[in-house]
A protein has these predicted regions:
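Residue-level recognition of single "structural anchor" positions
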Residues: 1-225
Length: 225
């Protein structure tokens, strides 16, 4: 659906990553001595517009600098002009956002979570206790009052509730990388064009002005075929 979400004027974008895995967790993969690139931890990068709730870009990959740049390049293609963008504290965003979006004149900030103890990683079933957040301006002139990732984090919770393969503490997980990718592609297309947002009372696509009606499932499947 990338061709329908391209060069959009936006105001405020929030980015985050969602952890899952394919086949087995990265720790198990390491113990087995496997170098199979199609199994292990799988991170879904998500960019959502604060006001329209439209998912502007997403990317399935590893939590690396390379995949972070691939994600921010997709966000750059989906947008135009200046806007505010807030990410979590993942260090790779600092270079990736400036590299991909700096020429557009974005105002970039990070919301860094402070933990009671050093978190092992977001792959833990019981994350370390978050005791606060620190707003860190990185590039441009971000509005401190708008530095937030609450909307994208709420959306990521909805993703986990909607797709069993992303639900924690279950025996459900993706067995193949391409199956997870296909599921995510359908989810985001359905979310943007078919699913009426409870707050907006229309779909994000209608709110963003890229659709004039609520899509039926059949229409979505034909468009993505």
């Amino acid at each position: 659906m990338e061709e329908r979400i391209h060069s959009l004027r936006v105001k405020d974008v929030q980015c985050d990553e969602l952890w899952g895995y394919v086949g087995m967790k990265e720790k198990t993969k390491a113990k087995k001595g496997s170098d199979d690139a199609t199994i292990g931890d799988a991170w879904t990068f998500v960019a959502i517009e604060r006001y329209s709730k439209l998912v502007l870009a997403w990317h399935l990959g590893r939590r690396t600098e390379r995949d972070t740049v691939a994600f921010t390049e997709k966000l750059a293609a989906a947008t135009q002009g200046s806007f505010q963008v807030t990410t979590d504290g993942f260090a790779a965003y600092r270079d990736a956002v400036v590299l991909s979006l700096g020429a557009q004149g974005v105002d970039f900030a990070q919301l860094v979570k402070l933990y009671a103890a050093n978190p092992e990683s977001e792959t833990r079933y019981s994350p370390a206790e978050c005791i606060g957040c620190k707003k860190v301006p990185v590039f441009g002139s971000p509005d401190p009052k708008q530095i937030s990732t609450s909307h994208v984090e709420t959306h990521n919770l909805s993703m986990r509730m909607s797709m069993r393969r992303l639900t924690r503490l279950t025996n459900a997980f993706s067995k193949k990388w391409e199956k997870l990718y296909a599921m995510l592609a359908l989810y985001f297309a359905h979310y943007n064009f078919c699913r009426v947002h409870q707050t907006l009372r229309v779909t994000p696509a209608i709110e963003a002005g890229i659709s004039d009606h609520i899509w039926e499932i059949k229409e979505l499947l034909v468009a993505t075929a």
